[in-house]
Amino acid sequence: MASSALAVSVAKPAASPPVAVAAVTPQRRLLPQCRGVRAAPVVRLRSGRARGVSVVCAAQGQETSFQVPDVTKSTWQSLVVESELPVLVEFWASWCGPCKMIDPVIGKLSKEYEGKLNCYKLNTDENPDIATQFGIRSIPTMMIFKNGEKKDAVIGAVPESTLVSSIDKYIGR
């Protein structure tokens, strides 16, 4: 048997930065009330993990939400208990992701039900006494009060239709 020697010539690779960037073609998706999506490429780190696509939404300049006023321990009695209208209170915290998701819905409902329903937000981190008084264990929690009494509660970032059906029971639409 003849022995054959195979000589392989390998070029020495040039020095590269520690992070290699993989080229990606971003998909263009439209989000509601946005001009479009700008995507960042996927970046592969040495650990093998990848960062996802970064989505940036640019509002089209129209008013997208209504600022819901805050209620605190000091204003609770006058704004909620003594209100002549039914009151929707959103119990929330600044660090809560689902609270941020439901916030625009509460703002929209506040605007739609203006004159029929008062809407307020209560920060549970800043007002733990009231949150404890009403047994708040999950946020966001939306409670409806009528004549100063708790009538209904909806827990979690629910669809707008769920909140509307709860509200409509107490405002006589």
Swiss-Prot record:
Compartment(s) of residence: Plastid, Chloroplast
Name of this chain's protein: Thioredoxin M1, chloroplastic
Species this protein is from: Oryza sativa subsp. japonica
Function: Probable thiol-disulfide oxidoreductase that may be involved in the redox regulation of chloroplastic enzymes.
CDD domains membership: TRX_family
Swiss-Prot/TrEMBL site (Contributes to redox potential value) positions: G97, P98
Stretch forming the transit peptide: 1-57
GO molecular function annotations of the record: protein-disulfide reductase activity
Family as reported in the entry's similarity comment: Belongs to the thioredoxin family. Plant M-type subfamily.
Domain Thioredoxin: from-to ranges: 58-172
